[in-house]
Amino acid sequence: MPATPMQHPRPRAATYRVQLHAGFTFDDAAAVVGYLADLGVSHLYCSPYLQAAEGSTHGYDVVDHGRLNDELGGGGAHRRLTRRLAQAGLGQVLDIVPNHMALAGRANAWWWDVLENGPSSRYASHFDIDWDPPQHKLAATVLMPVLGDHYGRVLEAGELAVERQGGSFTVRYHEHEVPLSPRSLDALLTRAAQRSGSAELDAVAAALGRLPHAHRTDPAAVAERHHDKEVLRARLAELCGERPAVAAAIDAEVDAVNGDADALDQLLGQQNYRLAYWRTAAEELSYRRFFDIETLAGLRVEDEAVFEATHRVILRLVAEGTVDGLRVDHVDGLADPQGYLDRLSEATGDGYVVVEKILAADEELPGSWPVAGTSGYDFLNHVSRLCVDSGGAAAIRACYARFTGAGEAYPEVVHAAKLQIMREDLAAEVERLTGLLADVCEGYRRQRDHTRRELRDVLREVVAAFGVYRGYVRPGRPVTPADRAHAAAAVAGVRRRRPDIDPELMTFIGELLVLGRPGKAEADFAVRFAQVSSAVMAKGVEDTAFYRYQPLVSLNEVGGDPASLGESAGGFHQAMARMARRWPETMLTLSTHDTKRSGDVRARIGLLSELPEAWERAIAAWARRNERHKRGGWPDRNAEYLLYQTLVGAWPIDSARAGAFLQKAAREAKVHTSWTDPCAEYDDALGAFVTAVLADQGFVADLTAFLAGHRIVERGRVSSLAQTTLLLTCPGVPDLYQGTEVWDLSLVDPDNRRPVDYEARRRLLAELAGAGPEAALARGDEGGPKLWLIHRLLQHRRRHPAGFGPDSGYQPLPVTGARAAHAVAFTRTGGLAVVVPRLVTGLVTGLAGGSADLARGSADLAGGSADLAGGWAGTMVELPGGAWTDVLTGGRIDGGAVGVAAMLRRFPVAVLAREA
């Protein structure tokens, strides 16, 4: 595919992410472009907007890559949005989904064709389907796990029915509809021909029976089958229209089949799919899916034809200059991420691309990837850890263990969760991987006697021991030291944990993982292992272990480490300096559509690490009071502990939102209840507990007293302002998630996808745009300080793009004094200096609550109140020489040793620009 370079790239000051759906369309987005331009962002960052499944709320369930989503307004509305962006001088970044498609009946023409024609479909190679699985019953067949009960019961209950539309035939099961293979219709149509006496219908039936078999996949047979079936289908439709008696005879035969379970069973047995009970998906699904969602089937974008078919519209938008950048969703699901990104880079002329890549704490983004960086979770977690007190975090962990009785260390929780996911939700993926390994072992006399059960057991252990999401080996290419190290660490971990496993088999698997054995089957195994490993990590850690182990949930974020004890300012500086050197245009974020808690919620919860004793006293008292609201001891103490953290982080919150969040958390934890095996008794007890607790006026009084006594709201706001400043000044391109430009106390989706009141934000911005810090601080309850800060810093970024560009660097500034550990200070290119507080509980001691008190909080942070417990206590920052102007307050400061108190006198953070 020829390169289509991104046209006239605009300086990337900041992106603003919006979630598009039927309730927020292209035209709705166009209506807020003026506000976003006034705010100072440079790019609108859109969720996927190719045609998605009907009613999609997110766009990741694409059904047609050839057009824009009709529910968003289609091409016309998109052109209006594009014109409005151009008028405002804004660019556009688009989220794309190369890994999978939604299986939404007729809406996905490719999948419909696969169901109709099996391996002989023109699109069979578009999807990652195993046409020769270990289960012989599924040979050349796609499992369709859509039934609410066992197949035979559903069939005999009359819930399956053949339907005719013109010359096409389908089977309907409630809202599900699947096509009948044209070749399977010959007997039914032959009987109808006999009934009606139609020789022409008899000829059509015979011709359908002579169509090339679905097993034939040579190009000539595929072309013949496709051409002939369409001709015959069209003639059949004409015949039914021209001769009512023929149509009546066909419909009578359809009715007869529907009334005879044996006849219908025989017809369904001739299809290229197997209708099945939905529970079979976990163990028998024969196509790769997005995690455990069987309605999202994996695509083979490693195939150039598939890449071109899925990216044609996207690359047209890039070539036209409509789209200035791309965010690649779930890059770890692909068979060959490097190859895909190379092809995408070539097709976009080395355009701006970031990837949704979840990095482990000690993992680096592959330097060979032609991308600007990640979508920002690595930055998010550095900031979250920075705002956690290490000593307090250790105490919180001990408190959590005492409260819940949970004695397992986090690595053990992860290991157990990953094994459970592989036994249950992703058993089909493990089974397919086991089959590949068994085939490989058959070719080695020292390995061939290992049974499938043994191999399955070993594979589960190796995947569970993998410390990163996946490796990136590429057949025929050198294996990187990082991939060798990750594979070796996993194998060593299994050897320690399971000495009963054959050591020679472990060595053999370790060699396979790094392409140490030649052969296509061996290479296929290594590639498939990486894809399975990624899915298991995501489902086992993010969506299971994170909901089981939760001492301090500000750390339980995508890519985070719940067992972390925080990060020092020095560690943060090292990470940012490395980012400036290697990924200076990576995306930065604090909140996304996928975060489990917003940045503001995490800012509050992180404060608990500074209050471990007070926190333990509070939850002990709350638990005693609320014991009476439980039913038979349910919910368990882990859920109760999570509820209390959630209330601290998101207060005020009503029982509906809190209950929905706790319910989702319990289902994800998969201990007492789950999505696939819900326990109504536990679910009801949990919901009733949340409702009763929040209706208990005495408890609410205790909770609000705790929040007020420790100034959680005010201190959380100060921490949020510090984190937001880092977002807007550290190396990279900051992204603001919709609505988070003011205080946002959202939880995991769907809570974080609620409608945004843009009119209120527009009015507030208009009132504060030209105001000083005191006016902004006085609007604290409305989110004024955060909005004002973002506006000021984005305006500065737009006026001085070079100061934040790829060559702008990052240099820590020395901080000295008793409170040095509470300050983070650095420069960018020597022309911008940033000073923000961290661990603010030890600094802000005099706040009493309310909007006006946030203004006093700024003075308290600066050491301006005599009643502070030390305040900044003479803490100094060594500024480079010269005169500096505060971008936020307009105040002037001379370089050299400057007191933090002086810099933060009027606002909780300082951003200084060196005067020319």
Question: What residue ranges belong to the model's regions?
Answer:
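Conserved short loop/turn motifs at secondary-structure junctions
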Residues: N99, R327-L334, A778
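Conserved, well-structured beta-alpha core segment at the onset of a catalytic domain
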Residues: G75-V93, M101, G105, W112, ...
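N-terminal beta-alpha lobe that positions the nucleotide/phosphoryl donor
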Residues: V93-L94, A102-A109, V114, R397-E412, ...
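Carbohydrate-interacting/catalytic domains
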Residues: M1-E54, G66-E71, R79, R83-Q87, ...
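Active-site microenvironment for binding and transforming phosphate-containing groups
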Residues: G467
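Active-site region of glycoside hydrolase catalytic domains
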Residues: G105-L180
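Aromatic- and acidic-residue-enriched segments that line the glycan-binding/catalytic groove
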Residues: S56-D64, H100-D130, S368-Y377, R753
